[in-house]
């Protein structure tokens, strides 16, 4: 696999209480999905935009990461 290992981490809102829409990669569906981030903590599977998430983690059918 060409995608970074952190793409396989679960969505993690972190320990703070903000309400920030973010995106994470879901390996089961090979798609980037929205979740609510608390603003601190969490993990690296956390992207500001769906495009950034796709560029980093979503594999194309040809086997490499898909370009945005």
UniProtKB/Swiss-Prot annotation:
Sites annotated May be the major determinant of the binding affinity for potassium channels: 5
Pfam families: Kunitz_BPTI
GO molecular function list: potassium channel regulator activity; serine-type endopeptidase inhibitor activity; toxin activity
Cystine bridges: 7-57, 16-40, 32-53
Entry keyword Hydrolase: no
Principal location listed in the UniProt entry: secreted
SMART domains, sorted: KU
Alphabetized UniProt keyword annotations: Disulfide bond, Ion channel impairing toxin, Potassium channel impairing toxin, Protease inhibitor, Pyrrolidone carboxylic acid, Secreted, Serine protease inhibitor, Toxin, Voltage-gated potassium channel impairing toxin
UniProt-listed InterPro entries: Kunitz_BPTI, Kunitz_BPTI_sf, Prtase_inh_Kunz-CS, TFPI/VKTCI-like
Domain of life of the source: Eukaryota
Site location (Reactive bond for trypsin): 17-18
Modified residues (Pyrrolidone carboxylic acid (Glu)): 1
PROSITE patterns found in the cross-reference section: BPTI_KUNITZ_1 (PS00280), BPTI_KUNITZ_2 (PS50279)
Cited SUPFAM superfamilies: BPTI-like
Occurrences of domain BPTI/Kunitz inhibitor (ranges): 7-57
One cellular component term from this protein's GO annotations in UniProt: extracellular space
Tissue specificity: Expressed by the venom gland.
CDD domains given in the database record: Kunitz_PPTI-like
The keyword Secreted is assigned to this record: yes
PANTHER family according to UniProt: BPTI_KUNITZ INHIBITOR DOMAIN-CONTAINING PROTEIN (PTHR10083:SF374), KUNITZ-TYPE PROTEASE INHIBITOR-RELATED (PTHR10083)
Function: Serine protease inhibitor that weakly inhibits trypsin (Ki=0.2 uM). May have potassium channel blocking activities.
Family affiliation: Belongs to the venom Kunitz-type family.
Protein name per its UniProtKB record: Kunitz-type serine protease inhibitor PPTI
Organism of provenance: Pseudocerastes persicus (Persian horned viper)
Organism taxonomic ancestry: Eukaryota, Metazoa, Chordata, Craniata, Vertebrata
